[in-house]
Amino acid sequence: MNVFGKKEEKQEKVYSLQNGFPYSHHPYASQYSRPDGPILLQDFHLLENIASFDRERVPERVVHAKGGGCRLEFELTDSLSDITYAAPYQNVGYKCPGLVRFSTVGGESGTPDTARDPRGVSFKFYTEWGNHDWVFNNTPVFFLRDAIKFPVFIHSQKRDPQSHLNQFQDTTIYWDYLTLNPESIHQITYMFGDRGTPASWASMNAYSGHSFIMVNKEGKDTYVQFHVLSDTGFETLTGDKAAELSGSHPDYNQTKLFTQLQNGEKPKFNCYVQTMTPEQATKFRYSVNDLTKIWPHKEFPLRKFGTITLTENVDNYFQEIEQVAFSPTNTCIPGIKPSNDSVLQARLFSYPDTQRHRLGANYQQLPVNRPRNLGCPYSKGDSQYTAEQCPFKAVNFQRDGPMSYYNFGPEPNYISSLPNQTLKFKNEDNDEVSDKFKGIVLDEVTEVSVRKQEQDQIRNEHIVDAKINQYYYVYGISPLDFEQPRALYEKVYNDEQKKLFVHNVVCHACKIKDPKVKKRVTQYFGLLNEDLGKVIAEGLGVPWEPVDLEGYAKTWSIASAN
């Protein structure tokens, strides 16, 4: 099956200029004023090549710079129509093509892909109704739950601003941030086990981490979290093996996936949701909006709904992997809403914004990002996924700007009443299409709409009962933040895994230059398990001085919540 519609090229390939005309000289020849003389400014072939070379690089991703990916096919195996009216989740057997990108988080594009770091796992599905993205990680939790902390957290994971050394040489700022923000302990407990060094991209899982809200045709809300689980199970490397590969084979994971697909293997993942009703959310021990917590499977079991099959390598890495742009805004299609998770709320802005910086204002017009119902090139040719299958042609009023090469032709850039230019309105939760959009809106129509929205908000706002319309607020630390990571360390990890965990932490934290930070690392883990803190102190060669959470906060706090 040829998902992306590649055609065999039958025409001769002729070396040409950028204008398409053949170049009649040797590609390595330059115009000189005389043999062994200076070159001429009129040599536009040379100038064109040098100018193009000078502009080959685009800004690398500020996070998730190191990565690779491939094409895929999604299939819906079980309908979710009872909890969402989102079109791709309705009919069993529905299939669509897509693309996936795997990555590390903190490192630059040249760093090893086996480094101890979360893995980004982002999917783009080319549905008939538009592009649908999942922007996930291979860990079900994250380091923080306050969106404002994300930029400074990433700063701490990158190079020291004075020495310009990264965490392979100096881990001081890495641990300084983490130990001053103890909500990170769950992610760290997960990541410094062997789960932090997956054996391959095809043998690791992916999680939304965030809670989303699915809405069904009756308007009922259901909180969901997505899980994408490898069909082969979760396979890991030891920390020592991952470190060895970082030096001997820094592109290990990329090589492995490329070779698997080249050899005809088609790794598969199974897709699940956990569901939580609003009533369950009000009784849940933790906030449904807390990115540092998981939902226990006993209370909220996995419900399968689909499969993802990795199908083939891309034709050009830059065009399809470097230029692909994911965003959680594309997760929130009709039938799926964002939760009040502040990190998710910030990502809704940050992801499209960074793509505009990295790729330009019209990044969504690039072939790899263009929806099928906007004439996506990947849906042409002999592909079974054609633009003609789309139920409607997508139109909006966004126009012009740099590199705009799909500018909607003669379509009006406003709500028009001219012949053959009337926009249709499609009800998001059914197949109704009407002429609802008009240039004139009566005040009474607006009032009816506002009342309906207020009623929906009252019915669906289950978690946050705001008394004022703004709070300056920092999530505080409490004993609850240590319950789940403590269970992970004490009950899930066996004795051998606990030894490896200590080994991994000590090998990483021993590169801390500041003795105060090194001491704090031992107390940080001591809050999780006192014996763990003590053995890490022994490994780091620092005195063991246990403190409770209140003492830890008093010793290391730098400011009040406001």
UniProtKB/Swiss-Prot annotation:
It catalyses: 2 H2O2 = O2 + 2 H2O. The active site is at H64, N137. One of its GO terms (molecular function) is catalase activity. GO terms for biological process: hydrogen peroxide catabolic process; response to hydrogen peroxide. Heme binds at Y351. Its cofactor is heme. Keywords: Cytoplasm, Heme, Hydrogen peroxide, Iron, Metal-binding, Oxidoreductase, Peroxidase. Pfam families: Catalase, Catalase-rel. PROSITE patterns: CATALASE_1, CATALASE_2, CATALASE_3. GO terms for cellular component: mitochondrion; peroxisome. Its EC number is 1.11.1.6. It is found in: Cytoplasm. It is an enzyme of class 1 (oxidoreductase). The keyword Protein biosynthesis does not apply. Belongs to the catalase family. Occurs in almost all aerobically respiring organisms and serves to protect cells from the toxic effects of hydrogen peroxide. Homotetramer. This is one of two catalases in S.cerevisiae; the other is catalase A, which is the peroxisomal form. This is Catalase T. It comes from Saccharomyces cerevisiae (strain YJM789) (Baker's yeast).
